[in-house]
Amino acid sequence: MTKAPATKKLQRVPSKAIWLFSGSDQLTQASDKTVKSTKSMDKEIVNLKKDLIRSRFLIQCVKIGRGYFTMLQEETAFKKHQQHLKKLQEEELNKFQPAKKYSDIQCRDTLLTTYEYEKMKKLEAGIIIRPFTPIHNCIMAPSLPESHVDPLFRQLCALHWLLEALTIDHTHHTMRPVIACWNPKDPGGSKSTIKKINKDKSMGQRWDHFVTAPKTKKFKAPAIRSLATRKPSRRGSALSLTRTSGGSSPQSSMMSVNPSSDEPTGSKDIEDNESSSTKPEEEVLHFSLQKLLEMVREDARRTILMETEMQKKAPSILSLVKQVKSDYGWKDWQTTHKSSERSSTTSGESHIQVTQKKSKGRANRDIIYCKTGICNTMRAKFYSVAQEAGFCLQDKMEILKKRQEERGLQKFHSFIVTSNFQKDIAKMRHQVSMVKGDAEEMADHWYFDLLSKLPEDLKSFRPAKKILTKLQKFGENLDLRIRPHVLLKVLQDLRIWELCSPDIAVAIEFVREHIIHMPQEDYVNWLQSRVNMPIRHRPILT
């Protein structure tokens, strides 16, 4: 019974606090992210359940007496057939379909020009037009017999930079800018640790601070002040002297008030000149120190304003003392003075308590709202990490499923000579190594297909040899898996002119089509939202 109203208050506070803060959009975004991540996690859990059901089904079939390897061969053949049908369907969608009637062509306002006629011929040939990508000097082309070496070299460098950025651990490493990938000394770019980059930045800032010329100190000449222009007020000087001389004798105070006393007129001028000459020049502070000083000043200003407001709101005791008349005796006046002082202090304390309660209520409301925001952001981060872990698990399971037949054959051949069950199991586990793909898979792989297309002039080019050896580690990994959202996350950090650059656009298209297998419509929609301009369908001819 006692806990019910407390829970109601906690539920009501965030809804009331929304109009007080401008950070409600972040909470909605975090909640949307959590909803999306939970959906994707549910999908991954369903896939995991399907894989477990499939493995149990295979175990039951083997127990009945069916062949394990024959079932795996049937599964791979069915999967290849499905992929072939999907590829044919995509080609049919991208294929040029001419008009059936001549009247449909005549309905256009203008006749086809020669360029449009050539464009239609290319469409009939099955060439897919991609945004910002060249046609002839391009690694996406089916053949490269008469291509130039320089554009192909730049495209290979951008391809290596993109693959490196997609596969590194972004928590500890980061990539250098894309422009650095075309350096002939280090083609393809390289990764670097975040600690090293921060150290280089600090060293650069120190060097700039050391190289910049220091500001010259300007010594101000002491201004000569005449006695006629300077007429200090006697009253102000007397008051200042009486304030400063708190512990002095009454004779000295009387001497300071006396106008006929002799004063050294030039003493103040000398002190002002000395203070102005000995005043040190203000040194140029660091940006972080300036920011810290501004924050401290702002905090001090706020505290002073709060104190002044509290003093204004509290009732003054002196106004009540002035109302007391001297009609009564000294004792009566003393008693009334004490009672009025007590009443005024109690009223002031009650007012201060009310204001403190209001401020505490607002502070508690702010804390509750901040806690809810922190909970939502932490929940979104947790779901994003769980989603990445689910993707990694799914990729590993797909790789194991893909290599299941080869690994099973290797394990089976290790049991040729049997001696002891435990020894045979240990021997089987030691003999299972990294399985290389068959000839058909290697022929269809993007790396070997790219090597077969490249001209001999490029292969003999010395910087191109370096970039091809760097691409070899990605090409020989037949089980390389990259998710589409990872590609979009890396491309989000690029600038617009980098996305529209022909060399980088070719590398992005190559990774999208041959490695990630991302649909072109999804990438074009993302690119239109990123570039914020309609993409023309006319290719860049180089």
Curated annotation (Swiss-Prot):
Alphabetized, the UniProt keywords read: Coiled coil
> Would the keyword Coiled coil be found if you checked this record's keyword annotation?
yes
Coiled coil segments of this chain: 70-97
The UniProt regions of compositional bias labelled Low complexity, in chain numbering, are 245-261, 342-351
Q: Where is the signal peptide?
A: none
Q: What InterPro entries does its record include?
A: DUF4698
Where is the region Disordered? 228-284, 334-358
Please identify the protein, giving its name as recorded.
Coiled-coil domain-containing protein 60
Tell me which species this is from. Rattus norvegicus
**Organism taxonomic ancestry:** Eukaryota, Metazoa, Chordata, Craniata, Vertebrata
